[in-house]
A protein has these predicted regions:
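Active-site helix-to-loop segments that bind/position phosphate- or nucleotide-bearing substrates
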Residues: 5-74
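Short, small-residue-biased leader/transition segments that mark boundaries at the very start
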Residues: 2-7, 223
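Glycine-rich anion/phosphate-binding loop at the beta-strand->alpha-helix junction
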Residues: 62-179
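Short, mixed-charge aromatic SLiMs
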Residues: 14-25, 119-121, 177-182, 225
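Internal helix-turn-beta structural module
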Residues: 154, 162-221
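Hydrophobic alpha-helical scaffolding
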Residues: 38, 42-46, 79-87, 96, ...
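A structural signal for short, well-ordered beta-strand segments
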Residues: 10-12, 72-74, 155-157, 204, ...
């Protein structure tokens, strides 16, 4: 959904070990974003849907659950949004995303994979594209030093497996101080990754709007003074 000229979309990057393709961090087409906005099971590579659904069903039948990853791409955020310290773009987005239940981790750009590379491999060279300055690659995920670079903002959020499963689990009895077993009754989602996509999408929208309002409020105050 749009925030002015800002657009963001999420997709299911993985369910368990079944993976979808990731966003091209440099070139994300409007057509892809539009297609993802109309789908209930949001995938870049639609052929991943069947094995993902089969894995979820297997977990349901075995009274278990499975986690996964949601990837988000944000286009059109102006250059210079954010702060180099505590109000950086990563800080604000992460704070909002960690408010979503079951989120256990977040990475931006090349993330943890980038930690395996040399600086010469992970750095993003700047180039002119007409009158616009861009980077050839986007390992920084659209954020440098807490401030937007104008490239697409890319992050991935890890969703843990649903804790409420119908299998017997070891626990403790607080009254008797003894070890015991817990058996949960009722209906529980075997995978909440699919449900998490629109939640993370809207949490992201709030974070980006908050960042942009801060930026333009400061500019307005400077202009008034």
């Amino acid at each position: 959904r749009g925030l002015g000229d800002v657009y963001k979309r999420q997709h299911i990057a993985s369910v368990g070990t079944v993976e979808d393709k990731l966003f091209n961090p440099v070139d994300i087409s409007d057509e892809l974003l539009e297609r993802l906005s109309t789908e209930k099971f949001c995938l870049i590579d639609e052929s991943a849907e069947v094995p993902m659904r089969e894995l979820i069903e297997d977990c349901r039948m075995s009274q278990d659950s499975i986690g996964g990853v949601v990837e988000c791409a944000i286009k059109g955020v102006p250059v210079g949004i954010g702060s180099p310290m505590f109000d950086g773009v990563e800080n604000v987005i992460a704070s909002m995303i960690f408010g979503v239940p079951a989120v256990k981790g977040i990475e931006f750009g090349s993330g943890f994979e980038g930690s395996k590379h040399k600086g010469s491999e992970n750095n993003d060279p700047f180039v002119y594209d007409g009158d616009t300055i861009k980077t050839e690659t986007n390992n920084h995920g659209g954020i440098l030093g807490g401030i937007t670079s104008g490239m697409p903002i890319i992050f991935r959020a890890a969703i843990k497996p649903t804790a409420s499963i119908s299998q017997k689990q070891n626990t403790v009895n607080l009254e008797t101080h003894e070890n015991t077993e817990l058996e949960i009754k009722g209906r529980h989602d075997p995978c909440i990754v699919v449900r998490a996509v629109p939640v993370i999408e809207n949490a992201t929208a709030i974070a980006i709007l908050d960042l942009m309002m801060d930026k333009y409020t400061i500019l307005s105050l400077i202009h008034i003074s």
